[in-house]
């Protein structure tokens, strides 16, 4: 037991928590913004899958990780706007649209990968891992001064570029939501669309903007998965992170800081599962750990929220007397 605890107290373990949390943070920010706009996007998983595939393919054919990243971002935005078109313009249930995107993200990406590689490589490939080299992946960054600090330097320095962008975007998204007119409009539309419309806010445009933002974040998350976390795209590589992000958004109370901390909790759970597997624990027992933590976290969040609601109702009842 003591040896296992020593493994958890290493800088490498904390470094892995941050690394694993990055794609969850991107997807959590996507969930937060659309929730502020008054609707849910459960298609985060599928959006990340499409972004991951397009990013890795464009990176290979353009021989540049930058163009691959740009392709992933564009894919995420365009597909999220397509979701918005079906939901807002055609009045399709947005939950059903999200389910459809998630299903397409699994089977559709595999189909596209096989078709594209068959046309360009002469054979159908079920993944792009054989195409992407280290030079085509998004680079890691070593922070000169911080890297020399004992323990902390090994935890903070040496991460992928997108990992630092994920944490920076937590701050920038919070500023956008609470310190800018756009953020005010997003929150107004989410709280009372009729009131927002009465003062000249275009509810439809704001919803499209929120949807586009969620797609942008999923683009970052997908690019991270196929061009940083792994070298290339493979089937179902997102592995439920889109759904975990929905849980992180709920646990974080719909706020950027809370969502980031919740994502780190889930990152810790996944890193713990990997450690358990490394020391010989059956993978069938280790792999469910992140999902068990997700369920436990949501139960705790629901209990705390319900307790707060009961206290508010009790206080309101006393004041009315």
Question: What are these model-derived regions, one by one?
Answer:
Residues 12-61, 65-69, 73-74, 78-95, ...:
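Single transmembrane alpha-helix segments in multi-pass membrane proteins
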